[in-house]
Amino acid sequence: MSVLFDAKAFLKTVTSQPGVYRMYDAGGTVIYVGKAKDLKKRLSSYFRSNLASRKTEALVAQIQQIDVTVTHTETEALLLEHNYIKLYQPRYNVLLRDDKSYPFIFLSGDTHPRLAMHRGAKHAKGEYFGPFPNGYAVRETLALLQKVFPIRQCENSVYRNRSRPCLQYQIGRCLGPCVEGLVSEDEYAQQVEYVRLFLSGKDDQVLTQLIARMEKASQNLEFEEAARIRDQIQAVRRVTEKQFVSNTGDDLDVIGVAFDAGMACVHVLFIRQGKVLGSRSYFPKVPNGTELGEVVETFVGQFYLQGSQMRTLPGEILLDFNLSDKTLLADSLSELAGRRINVQTKPRGDRARYLKLARTNAATALISKLSQQSTITQRLTALASVLKLPAVKRMECFDISHTMGEQTVASCVVFDANGPLRAEYRRYNITGITPGDDYAAMNQVLRRRYGKAIEESKIPDVILIDGGKGQLGQAKAVFAELDVPWDKNHPLLLGVAKGADRKAGLETLFFEPEGEGFSLPPDSPALHVIQHIRDESHDHAISGHRKKRAKVKNTSTLETIEGVGPKRRQMLLKYMGGLQGLRNASVEEIAKVPGISQGLAEKIFYSLKH
């Protein structure tokens, strides 16, 4: 317990009502957020002579101040607690490292509805199906739907400006509602209804309707139509055979957990209308000494309550752990959803199978994660030995990418004790240098990165410079001139030159820009971590450069046309679905874009053609 914090005096002022408390250290940083049904009773438990765990002892030793917020109900306290955790990210709380919204399949409410992937707030008119665990699962489902039910997936800006059908129509992946006469309104509406039923888990209804239509077409001697419907029936059956489907039409999330060596994996199985849409593993940040019950309780609260704006709540949640606050959680989620949400911990039948599946996946993912962490730890230990350092807790690596000197981009990649720290990867657009001058580019990015105040925890132990002696010389010169409040002599600067024929395993390392370098054996773990971070940096630089080059390519042609400014350029690209759509458009189609006159449309048309 902190000597400066008077616990007895503080506890005399605390109420016995429900609420939330925030604990601060000497630097004024929030180090823990908690909730309580009885604030006085809960906070008193921190200042007993025999504390429950080492984690609590370490926490209490740093307390300098405690702020209390009283709430009317336990539900309000629970919601506020998770909002504070998300805001402050306290180091003694279990933290869910997941800020991405989940994707849905969106069926629009247009006259001719379209299918698309959607993330974020649901403002657009239409129906949303999901959530799916990731974008890949949505794209895979959309590709499958396009083969079975050929309704459009194009943007409205493209759809409204077509005079002839696109390639998707030619290969049978779209019915072509953009062009009058290609498909009847009834047929298109029928296919949309099939999609709606299919995504709602009502595959049997789809098959029943298709079989009835096939038999009717056959009776009317419309054999080509009957054959087309037969093929569609076979396609639907092939799809449903591959899916793990429950007969009960469940709408639930299943949460399994595994905990070992201070690391936790929580695996969530998403089931909607009886279909497993996919699953996802999470590795929350767990402070030392945290018990499994706290991990599960905090994860579930953060997973649903922090992401409430983006996450669709199922009717039921199956848990692999019996929570002490299960009723409170269910009540809070029900209040949030405006309907009853059940939280179940001892399911039977199919639900028990689901839970076993989630538990198995959590254990498998945790074993894999621990194995990866063991490997990166071994490699960093080997690197520290080679470089004669006590430890390598943080590394940063730089690379430069450009095309013939144009659109130069520098990348900075960060590794910590757990490997790639992608949240801290950065790209820098390099300007004001002679095109193709990689030395000047490296000089600029290092000054921008290190010529400012840096938190002590973010000072790297090793800075890897991809490029060999010359680039290392630039780095040494930059650091010699730095005037910063942190210890600029702490990072070890290490140059890496590619081997002969740029083959992996033949790299040469340099401590100084003059003299001979040294090489490591191809099977050296230290070399493997150097190759890993260098390849990450190279890929990060190239992907950034490609994005920048594509952006310039898509806009520079239009910028040269007199009368086309930023707003008109944006309008043209939006209505034509991109530069390629604009290149393929006629003068009449271009003139339909708001703000584009007939004369300007002709000028744009001929400029793009020539």
UniProtKB/Swiss-Prot annotation:
Domain GIY-YIG: 16-94
Gene Ontology BP annotations: nucleotide-excision repair; SOS response
A GO molecular-function descriptor: DNA binding
PANTHER family from the UniProt entry: UVRABC SYSTEM PROTEIN C, UVRC/OXIDOREDUCTASE
Subunit organization: Interacts with UvrB in an incision complex.
Stated role: The UvrABC repair system catalyzes the recognition and processing of DNA lesions. UvrC both incises the 5' and 3' sides of the lesion. The N-terminal half is responsible for the 3' incision and the C-terminal half is responsible for the 5' incision.
Name the record gives this protein: UvrABC system protein C
Taxonomic source organism: Citrobacter koseri (strain ATCC BAA-895 / CDC 4225-83 / SGSC4696)
